[in-house]
Regions:
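Sec-dependent bacterial lipoprotein signal peptides
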Residues: 1-16
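Short, surface-exposed recognition loops and adjoining beta-strand edges that mediate ligand/DNA contacts
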Residues: 28-34, 58-75, 146, 150, ...
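Membrane-proximal, proline-rich intrinsically disordered regions
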Residues: 18-60, 215
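Conserved, well-structured interaction surfaces
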Residues: 41, 45, 76-143, 155, ...
Length: 370
């Protein structure tokens, strides 16, 4: 009997020891249901990483390709469009999967913030809503109405309408604006970043009043200013500048997205694969004195290369999401003719161009598009 009692006590001691070991906080991975306040910082930066990297190179180039702004040698832009838009092709399916993968990460973060307490984590809460709005703007502008997932689910869900998606985006951006703080770092989401994205969203929806209100608020805040030296924004030795509202840092230790590698040829100082080039139509839109031209289009050998991502194969360049130059254009279009002409001309003068001669709403819109 004594032997059995001793054995039982030994088993209990082992079980108790195992229990203590199993109670140790996990260090390498954790399920969404097990997330606590201790995980918020890691989750937050995980979301930043997913948002920067998941779209992939073609995700960032999507609208330039589909709009005919860039093309491949010996191809017409329409050929690129037809090849890119194959329904079952990876260019389409990879983006769809990537955006919903990003959404999964954001929803996990939001659930964790709500569990830990929103008031104590308002900035992270605001960042998550900003990113969810960005994801749905990417989705709705590519596919129209898509399923709105406020929480993660493995169930099959129906597509929501385009109108529902835009309403959701507006709601998300307002939550972001209400909870974020003013910018101190262009690589972190801020109240101004949310206002800039909201201005773009309302312009897309045709709500010119709200778009103009948000754009004018940013312009008149005095926090941002147009850069006379365009190379400070996109040049080889780009620096912190007065124009950028929010950008993805694209740190080489965390990303494989190197847009410059796609745009520069191997003869370039930082090398490149030279897959895509600006079309001559786009190059012709630059005026002779346009200060953007020598930064945006760089000659390498006999090739005209896209110059905004000078890292080539050597390093990743920041990807700008919002800058005050865009906000001037949003304001000009939203205010319309004639009120928007001055905002457009302020931007044109800073880029070395003469004032627009637009004399109607249609001409102003055309000038904005150029």
């Amino acid at each position: 009997m004594k032997r059995y009692i001793t054995l039982a006590l030994s088993v209990l001691m082992v079980l108790n020891s195992c229990s203590q070991m199993l109670d140790i906080y996990p260090r390498s991975a954790i399920s969404p249901d097990g997330v606590t306040a201790n995980d918020l910082s890691a989750l937050r930066y995980g979301v930043y990483s997913a948002m920067q990297n998941k779209p992939g190179t073609t995700g960032y180039m999507c609208f330039d390709l589909l709009g005919g702004d860039i093309t491949q040698k010996n191809y017409n832009p329409i050929d690129i469009y037809n090849g890119y838009m194959k329904t079952l092709g990876s260019n389409v399916t990879d983006q769809w999967n990537s955006f919903y993968n990003e959404l999964y990460h954001v929803n996990v973060l939001l659930a964790a913030v709500e569990k830990a307490g929103i008031e104590a984590n308002k900035v992270i809460y605001g960042e998550a809503h900003y990113f969810r709005a960005m994801i749905y703007m990417n989705l709705v502008t590519r596919w129209g109405g898509v399923p709105i997932l406020r929480v993660n689910t493995s169930d099959r869900v129906a597509r929501d309408t385009v109108e529902d998606c835009w309403d959701f985006i507006n709601e998300e951006l307002q939550l972001a604006i209400d909870n974020l703080e003013t910018s101190t770092d262009m690589y972190m989401v801020s109240k101004e970043a949310a206002q800039a994205l909201a201005a773009r969203a309302y312009l897309y929806q045709g709500n010119m009043t709200k778009a103009a209100e948000l754009a004018e608020g940013l312009i008149t805040s005095g926090k941002y200013a147009l850069e006379k030296d365009f190379s400070k924004i996109f040049g080889y030795e780009r620096k912190a500048n007065s124009e950028t509202i929010f950008a993805f840092r694209m740190d080489d230790t965390e990303t494989s997205v190197k847009l410059g590698s796609q745009y520069f040829t191997y003869d370039y100082v930082n090398k490149g694969s030279g897959w895509y080039f600006p079309t001559q139509t786009i190059i012709n839109l630059f005026g002779a004195n346009d200060t953007r031209l020598p930064v945006s289009v760089v000659t390498v050998g006999t090739d005209k290369c896209m110059g905004k991502y000078p890292g080539g194969q050597a390093y990743s360049d920041p990807i700008i999401i919002s800058r005050i130059g865009e906000i001037y254009l949003i304001s000009a279009e939203a205010l319309g003719f004639p009120d928007g002409c001055e905002r457009l001309n302020q931007l044109r003068r800073m880029r070395g161009l003469s004032d627009s001669t637009a004399s109607s709403e249609a001409e102003l819109k055309e000038a904005v598009l150029q």
